[in-house]
Structure formats: structure tokens, C-alpha cells
């Protein structure tokens, strides 16, 4: 069931659950964007196609807030905002673990390489060509 956190004429923010995908991929699973379109179509009795822009995504294995643009103008403005403030925006991931870590505080750094054929990313301990650095602090 779709959990709408906020909506107005320009944007709609929803809670993405773990394992939901934001946009269609080769898995064929129904993306959150289609669920939001169906919600808007039904709630506002919209005929035809519903416009919905996707200015950002949240990875499939995690939950979080996703903001969708309800108009092309809102999408343009959100894209510009995300681009201009890229260095100020950060993602914070909270993890639930079965056992306490050995240390109370540590910083872990890994290097992520995406495999587009399998639609997965792999983490490495050492830098690799084309890898993106990922840091975890706890």
C-alpha cells in the first residue's frame, strides 16, 4: 500500500519500502513511479496518462523518502536544485544488525563497481578503475 507523506500540485513525496524499485528495470517488477501514477489518476479522476517526473532515486535494498514531480516545471526545478546543491546533499543509511560490532566506532571505506548486466553493485576493499568510494561511519 502506497504511503504518501506529502503532496501538493507540484510534488508528491512517498515512503519507499525495502525492495521497491523507483523506476522500471529489466526485472519487470512494478515500479513505485507506476503506483504513484495510479494513485494520482484515481484520487483526482484524471483521464489519460498522468505525468510524473523522477528527479532522484533510492536504492532497491533500502527504504526512504522519494520525491516525484507532478509537473515538468517542477521536475526542471528539482533537477536544478539537486544539481546546484549536490555537495550539500548527503544520504544517511541506518542499519539494523543482529550483533553488535566489535568496536564502538569505526570508519569503513569500500569501492563500489556497478555491473549493469546483473543490475548489481559489488564492493571492494581496494580502489578499482571506475569505482565509486563509499564510506560507512559508526
Task: Please annotate each region the language model reported.
Residues 1-138:
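RNA pseudouridine synthases
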Amino acid at each position: 500500500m502506497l504511503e504518501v507523506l506529502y503532496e501538493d500540485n507540484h510534488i508528491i513525496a512517498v515512503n519507499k519500502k525495502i525492495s521497491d524499485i523507483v523506476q522500471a528495470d529489466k526485472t519487470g517488477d512494478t515500479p513505485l513511479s507506476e503506483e504513484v501514477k495510479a494513485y494520482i489518476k484515481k484520487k483526482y479522476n484524471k483521464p489519460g496518462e498522468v505525468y510524473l517526473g523522477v528527479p532522484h532515486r533510492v536504492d532497491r535494498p533500502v527504504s526512504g523518502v522519494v520525491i516525484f514531480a507532478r509537473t515538468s516545471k517542477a521536475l526542471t526545478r528539482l533537477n536544478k536544485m539537486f544539481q546546484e546543491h549536490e555537495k550539500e546533499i548527503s544520504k544517511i543509511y541506518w542499519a539494523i544488525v543482529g550483533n553488535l560490532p566489535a568496536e564502538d566506532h569505526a570508519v569503513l571505506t569500500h569501492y563500489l563497481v556497478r555491473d549493469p548486466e546483473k543490475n548489481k553493485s559489488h564492493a571492494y576493499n581496494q580502489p578499482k578503475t571506475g569505482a565509486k568510494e563509499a564510506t560507512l561511519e559508526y
